[in-house]
């Protein structure tokens, strides 16, 4: 049995949710209603996020990138955590509902690109279009956009020990099939509503300490 870690990006690896930061900075007020409908599950993630990015003109590309480079912060302990999982031969994947145009630059030099799964964006028209290269498989009907539970099934074996790290509604379906969940913020609320066991965290030092104990037990 091997340990596999599946980690969210926005609000998990980074301190802030970058999509929400983009919307607050660049989108019109109407985006707030769409965001609330996503969180209340009135809109699927795929439908809601597609609508959000249709508010953003493509000519803001460079300005958005610069804004995120200046404002996005990597969560405390992440660099050391990556060294830890590599040293212990633990498989690590970023499974992010975020967008390629900011996920790849912010993780450059930290995570190999082949271990990152995120959505793709098209800047060829007036407004940003989101493409969805990792859709739900036949086990999931939630219109996730990037389907984290489907990616877990694709990337792992049933006898692997699955760890999910996340912070929001977008991580709920993955949390449902994890052997261990590390949660913060809104994902804690959703785990409690769905009776999913979880360990709260604020830094990756917290997660690393828990994983050390887990490795000792597994050994």
UniProtKB/Swiss-Prot annotation:
UniProt pathway annotation: Amino-acid biosynthesis; L-methionine biosynthesis via salvage pathway; L-methionine from S-methyl-5-thio-alpha-D-ribose 1-phosphate: step 4/6
Keywords: Amino-acid biosynthesis, Hydrolase, Methionine biosynthesis
Disulfide bond sites: none
Catalytic activity: 2-hydroxy-5-methylsulfanyl-3-oxopent-1-enyl phosphate + H2O = 1,2-dihydroxy-5-(methylsulfanyl)pent-1-en-3-one + phosphate
Superkingdom as given in the UniProt entry: Bacteria
Keyword Hydrolase assigned: yes
EC number: 3.1.3.87
InterPro entries: HAD-like_hydrolase_phosphatase (IPR050849), HAD-like_sf (IPR036412), HAD-SF_hydro_IB_MtnX (IPR017718), HAD_hydro_PyrdxlP_Pase-like (IPR006384), HAD_sf (IPR023214)
MF-aspect GO terms: 2-hydroxy-3-keto-5-methylthiopentenyl-1-phosphate phosphatase activity
GO BP terms in the entry: L-methionine salvage from methylthioadenosine
Family stated for the protein in its record: Belongs to the HAD-like hydrolase superfamily. MtnX family.
Free-text function comment from the UniProt entry: Dephosphorylates 2-hydroxy-3-keto-5-methylthiopentenyl-1-phosphate (HK-MTPenyl-1-P) yielding 1,2-dihydroxy-3-keto-5-methylthiopentene (DHK-MTPene).
Record-given protein name: 2-hydroxy-3-keto-5-methylthiopentenyl-1-phosphate phosphatase
């Amino acid at each position: 049995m091997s340990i596999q870690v599946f980690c969210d990006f926005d609000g998990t690896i980074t301190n802030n949710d970058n999509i929400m930061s983009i919307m607050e900075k660049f989108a019109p007020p109407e985006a707030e209603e769409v965001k609330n409908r996503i969180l209340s599950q009135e809109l699927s993630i795929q439908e809601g996020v597609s609508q959000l990015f249709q508010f953003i003109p493509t000519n803001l590309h460079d300005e958005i990138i610069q804004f995120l480079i200046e404002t996005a912060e990597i969560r405390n302990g992440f660099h050391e955590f990556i060294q830890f999982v590599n040293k212990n031969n633990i498989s690590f994947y970023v499974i992010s509902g975020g967008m390629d145009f900011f996920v790849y630059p912010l993780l450059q030099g930290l995570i190999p690109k082949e271990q990152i799964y995120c959505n793709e964006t098209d800047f060829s028209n007036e407004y940003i279009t989101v493409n969805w290269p990792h859709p739900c498989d036949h086990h999931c009907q939630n219109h996730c956009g990037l389907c984290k539970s489907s990616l877990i099934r694709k990337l792992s074996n049933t006898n692997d020990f699955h760890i999910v790290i996340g912070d929001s509604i977008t991580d709920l379906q993955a949390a449902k099939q994890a052997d261990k969940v590390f949660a913060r913020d809104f994902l804690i609320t959703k785990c409690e509503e769905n009776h999913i066991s979880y360990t709260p965290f604020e830094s990756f030092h917290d997660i690393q300490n828990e994983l050390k104990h887990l490795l000792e037990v597994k050994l």
